[in-house]
Amino acid sequence: MMDDKTKNDQQESNEDKDELELFTRNTSKKRRQRKRSKATHFSNQNKDDTSQQADFDEEIYLINKDFKKEQGNEENNDSASSHANDNNIDDSTDSNIENEDYRYNQETDDQNESNGIAVDNEQHQSAPNEQNSDSNDEETVTKKERKSKVTQLKPLTLEEKRKVRRKRQKRIQYSVITILVLLIAVILIYMFSPLSKIAHVNINGNNHVSTSKINKVLGVKNDSRMYTFSKKNAINDLEEDPLIKSVEIHKQLPNTLNVDITENEIIALVKYKGKYLPLLENGKLLKGSNDVKINDAPVMDGFKGTKEDDMIKALSEMTPEVRRYIAEVTYAPSKNKQSRIELFTTDGLQVIGDISTISKKMKYYPQMSQSLARDSSGKLKTRGYIDLSVGASFIPYRGNTSTQSESDKNVTKSSQEENQAKEELQSVLNKINKQSSKNN
């Protein structure tokens, strides 16, 4: 009876073991499935899930262990007569416990492996989801990379800044040196090439001094070069000529000299030792100048001392165009007018005036001369003179007709011509005064 009972107990215990093993396998399988699903969907919470799962597994392990102990105690109470069976049952329970411990360790290993798989699945199993949202993920990744690149920029150290500064300075030095070398090379090529030889000399502003004389003073030769030609020496040599007032010389690359001459005007010809010499605007007589070009200069006669200086000043204030109308200036004082002068013009008129006002009044002479009536040959129909000493008036000469008569008819005719000439000249002077007032 005892043997049958022990056999039944062993069979029941084996069945219980099988059920327990099946239960544990099912539970472990379910747990692994849950872990895998959780690992795929909640990969960001792996550490928390692993800790919670470990606690959960530990609780199940303790529950199973308590259950086995209680079952073993009940069997010990039912079969108190058989200590051998109890020992076998204890051994079996111990072995079951050891098996449970082994399974628990194996499950924990599986759990760790599943966690590793979950981590790997984060990169591999989530690929389909990542492929479905490539555009959004790529945008976020690029933004993160840009931010990381910006944040990863580290400030330069002092030594690095010095290195950067040295490199920049070296680049600047190299560029400056290359520019200087090229510039020096160009200058050397120009200096020793035919381009540097003076090939053209342009002279402007010379009316009385001949061009050949200016070229002789400049001293330009066939082998003269631009960089050896001294402008200062040439200017000083040219200004020694009394006719030349000032000189400007400009070098125009590659091989041209521009010479601008400003001359002292010849305002009159003065008799000196039986010869008429040019008188300059600065009051100097031009002696020993046979090659001077004298175009149209009035002849001064009878002036001395301060009156000569005043007349020179008056002529210098006139324009060259007005001076060309004057053929001769004579000092002709009267009792009441010590500054009275007489001018004889190139168009056959005589002008009476005063030294102090003659320069202002003579600027209207071209218009006055054109207003007078002339014949086909250009001579005045009514010969006479213009009085500019006080105001301005035209006074015909008496007896200017072809037949001189003592009758009253001829006297009346002469007076009528004189009045007509005065009216014509006065109308011209009035027009001139109006134009001058408008211009002012």
Curated annotation (Swiss-Prot):
Cite the residue spans of the region called Disordered. 1-97, 123-154, 397-440
| Stretches with biased composition (Low complexity) | 78-87
Extracellular side, ranges: 196-440
Query: Where, per UniProt, does this protein localize?
Result: Cell membrane
One GO cellular-component annotation of the UniProt record comes to: cell division site
Superkingdom of source: Bacteria
Q: Which membrane topology describes this protein?
A: Single-pass type II membrane protein
Span-the-membrane segments of this chain are 175-195
> Where mainly located?
membrane
Compositional bias ranges of the Acidic residues kind: 12-21, 88-97
Polar residues: compositionally biased ranges: 124-134, 427-440
Enumerate the Cytoplasmic topological stretches: 1-174
Name it.
Cell division protein DivIB
| InterPro entries xref list | Cell_div_FtsQ/DivIB_C, DivIB, FtsQ_DivIB, POTRA, POTRA_FtsQ_type
A biological process from GO: FtsZ-dependent cytokinesis
Q: Where is the composition biased (Basic and acidic residues)?
A: 1-10, 406-425
